[in-house]
Amino acid sequence: MRDIVFVSPQLYLSSQEGWKSDSAKSGFIPILKNDLQRFQDSLKHIVDARNSLSETLLNSNDDGSIHNSDQNTGLNKDKEASIADNNSANKCATSSSRYQELKQFLPISLDQQIHTVSLQGVSSSFSRGQIESLLDHCLNLALTETQSNSALKVEAWSSFSSFLDTQDIFIRFSKVDEDEAFVNTLNYCKALFAFIRKLHEDFKIELHLDLNTKEYVEDRTGTIPSVKPEKASEFYSVFKNIEDQTDERNSKKEQLDDSSTQYKVDTNTLSDLPSDALDQLCKDIIEFRTKVVSIEKEKKMKSTYEESRRQRHQMQKVFDQIRKNHSGAKGSANTEEEDTNMEDEDEEDDTEDDLALEKRKEERDLEESNRRYEDMLHQLHSNTEPKIKSIRADIMSAENYEEHLEKNRSLYLKELLHLANDVHYDHHRSFKEQEERRDEEDRAKNGNAKELAPIQLSDGKAISAGKAAAITLPEGTVKSENYNADKNVSESSEHVKIKFDFKKAIDHSVESSSEDEGYRESELPPTKPSERSAAEDRLPFTADELNIRLTNLKESRYVDELVREFLGVYEDELVEYILENIRVNQSKQALLNELRETFDEDGETIADRLWSRKEFRLGT
């Protein structure tokens, strides 16, 4: 009973004292004392949500009272303000569910095609609600500035994104009896966007009209309305507010994504495990969960990219259909003209033929231009966009490099210690330093070979000092040769150096080396053949004898230790492969060729060590 405590969730949620007790009470539930913190954490988010809801209600009540007071003080408005209020009311009444998918947005009549425009350069991070709010404000401002009380409104809109930072917004206005209101609205919006682009470089929105819509507007355009700077500043401030909200939402989303990877393992659920294994187990759990979250993010990005590509394909089909219809209408018109002109004179026929050829040439040029455009578009989607995404990912990774390195430090150390089995990994980094140190010891002990002067023998032959020291001669001969050598050295100081012929120098060096070898062989004691090591290329053993020796070598686990020394881990398959290679080929060179593919330069060291084992020596 000492490990049990009684708690009341109702009292805890109402922030009352006495919500926990050591004795049983009515309405209290028993839990372990170790689970008390978990109980508080599970109910904490409920309390936080309730507090945030209360604050929201208080703020909304305050805003409502302020709004009512503003309405009471602003009853008297001029004609311009009343028009804006009426248009705002109309927009609010129709602002819901105006977005349509791209395939549903396709215009089915000429009126719908004329009343359809597009906005280019809108940020891809804008939500549908933010886009509708921006469109409503722009339309209200245009109707107010053009002094129009028309019922013009946004009937539907759609969007098309090429998976870059911007998207295209297609807008279809409702058809009204007053064509002047529609024309003036488009002219004012176009002038407004152009005016803001001159003042602010970050504003990229531009109004684009189709050819039919452009001709329709130009035929009915009277005086182009002027844009007031204060109205342009007002619209730009609305645009910046929406952009700031988008940035804040994106930052919150990034924080949420980061929090999804910042996972903490509850050690209370792992209480039955030894404490020395908890740290590594927690790291493995966090690593696994982070990997799963990353995979889910990649799947989501891939699905988004597939949806964008499907939209592009659908839009391309729509454009192809419109192009075919337009080409068919041109072809039928050309056919009728040719039939009519068949009855004219020969000169007129020749002129018409030239005109048809010119039209066909223009059509071919148009098709070629469209083909180049499609190729460039394909190049953009297949090469440019993936490169941009990859560069952005590299930039983000480089910006957070130290944080990522510190977070995964234990994983990188583990990989460095246990998984460093790359074929190009250098396992003997200090080999050069060891060789240099041994060379210095040899020079200190025996002297520098380059500085030793050649010694002149009695017969006139030159021999190096190192070879002369290794030769053992009778006492009298040594004395006479030393006397001759001293004499020659003294005489050489008085005469210039003689340049020997190249061939004679080679002959002398060969003779001196042969004499040196003869003296050394005479001094070395004879060795028994049974004690010589089988260091030749091929092993002089029968198959049965070789199998016995390989079995002894395998039981000694010498090959296993060699593999572990150069790879860092035990590899049973590699050990079996090495032994099988020796059994089949019985050749050191064949084994060396195979080991170089795995151990690179260390393969020669491994082969030398194996061939120097007692199992491969004769007489053992």
UniProtKB/Swiss-Prot annotation:
InterPro entries: PWI_dom. One of its GO terms (cellular component) is U1 snRNP. It comes from the Eukaryota. Residues 59-75, 258-270 have a biased composition (Polar residues). GO terms for molecular function: RNA binding. Residues 246-256, 356-373, 431-445, 517-537 have a biased composition (Basic and acidic residues). Residues 335-355 have a biased composition (Acidic residues). Residues 59-82, 246-270, 323-373, 428-452, 509-537 are annotated as: Disordered. The modification Phosphoserine is found at residues 512, 514. Residues 296-385 form a coiled coil. Present with 782 molecules/cell in log phase SD medium. Component of the 18S U1 snRNP particle, a subcomplex of the spliceosome. Belongs to the SNU71 family. Component of the U1 snRNP particle, which recognizes and binds the 5'-splice site of pre-mRNA. Together with other non-snRNP factors, U1 snRNP forms the spliceosomal commitment complex, that targets pre-mRNA to the splicing pathway. This is U1 small nuclear ribonucleoprotein component SNU71. It comes from Saccharomyces cerevisiae (strain ATCC 204508 / S288c).
